[in-house]
């Protein structure tokens, strides 16, 4: 019998190294997390999961986190898709500067963005003080609405980045063919452009959902008692009332399961729109003014 020899070339070594890193930094931590959630003092128990689902304060955090993530995802798509569309199809004044500013929003830590909005719209914030001088009270950055608002401004640039690439991959001949058949304006956008970019839209939606669901900095600063998964896990590990590692591990396992379900739903939906776009004729930018000069 002849045995094939493994070729230890550069790429095989890289592949093996990546596999080892994957096992160490992903599989092993999740395995330990699962073990900690069902083993207490060396005994198998589901007490941590029972405690989680027995109190509304705990299990409502599932709905709070998912609700925030869905709202942020929807708002980010509503902002990001039109932004990317006009940037990709039109020569707007200052378009490059706007795109750079949009990218800068993704580079700051969540704590920085949340704290900045506290300075603007907190109880003693600049905008809050101006509104109070005009007799407008009750405007606050804290709570559910504030979390959604701050996270949306932080995450919608991810949609812009994804959709800008997708729009530029559309073959201009398809758009010209649609126009020749009478499909123009909003109808062309819905029936042609949106259909061609649907896989990218779903991918961007999943990314925003996951980032929002896992965000800790924004809810802990402006949540004001609105419990979310990351804050709940943090409080169990480093809370003022002591630590409960097993309960925190159980909450983390539930969070992993929720994100896995969302991922499966996204993959199932994206499989319905699986195709490849090759822009043999890139999209021609339209001018919004008589000047053909790009900003």
Question: Can you name each region flagged by the protein language model?
Answer:
Residues 17, 74, 104, 152-171, ...:
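Transmembrane alpha-helices
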Residues 12, 17-60, 66, 134, ...:
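Short membrane-interfacial helix/loop motifs at transmembrane-helix boundaries
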Residues 5-11, 51-57, 213, 219-260:
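Interhelical loop and adjacent transmembrane-helix boundary motif
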Residues 2-6, 71-102, 115, 163, ...:
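Transmembrane-helix boundary motif in ABC transporter permease subunits
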Residues 27-35, 78-85, 112-115, 124, ...:
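Membrane-embedded alpha-helices of multi-pass transport/permease systems
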Residues 171, 187, 224-230, 261-289:
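Feature of multi-pass inner-membrane transport and sensor proteins
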Residues 178, 287-294:
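Conserved small/polar residues in nucleotide/adenosyl-binding loops
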Residues 2-4, 46-50, 59, 94-97, ...:
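Membrane-interfacial helix termini and adjacent extracytoplasmic/periplasmic loops
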């Amino acid at each position: 019998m002849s045995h094939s020899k493994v070729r230890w070339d550069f790429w095989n070594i890289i592949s093996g190294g990546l596999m080892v890193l994957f096992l160490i930094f992903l599989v092993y931590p999740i395995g330990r997390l699962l073990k900690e959630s069902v083993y207490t003092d060396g005994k198998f128990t589901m007490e941590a999961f029972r405690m989680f689902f027995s109190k509304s304060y705990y299990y409502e955090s599932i709905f709070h986190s998912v609700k925030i993530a869905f709202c942020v995802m929807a708002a980010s798509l509503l902002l990001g898709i039109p932004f990317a569309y006009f940037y990709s199809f039109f020569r707007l004044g200052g378009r490059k500067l706007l795109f750079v500013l949009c990218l800068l929003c993704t580079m700051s830590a969540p704590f920085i963005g949340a704290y900045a909005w506290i300075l603007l719209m907190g109880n003693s914030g600049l905008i809050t003080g101006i509104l109070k001088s005009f007799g407008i009270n009750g405007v606050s950055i804290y709570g559910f609405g504030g979390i959604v608002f701050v996270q949306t401004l932080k995450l919608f640039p991810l949609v812009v980045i994804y959709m800008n690439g997708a729009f530029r991959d559309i073959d201009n001949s398809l758009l010209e063919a649609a126009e020749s058949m009478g499909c123009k304006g909003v109808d062309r956008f819905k029936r042609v452009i949106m259909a061609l970019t649907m896989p990218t839209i779903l991918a961007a939606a999943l990314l925003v959902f996951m980032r929002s669901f896992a965000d800790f900095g924004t809810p802990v600063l402006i949540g004001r008692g609105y419990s979310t998964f990351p804050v709940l896990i943090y409080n169990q590990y480093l809370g003022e009332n002591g630590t409960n590692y097993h309960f925190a591990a159980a909450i983390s396992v539930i969070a992993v399961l929720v994100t896995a379900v969302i991922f499966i739903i996204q993959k199932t939906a994206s499989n319905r729109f699986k195709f490849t776009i090759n822009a043999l004729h890139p999209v021609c930018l339209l001018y919004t003014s008589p000047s053909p000069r790009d900003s």
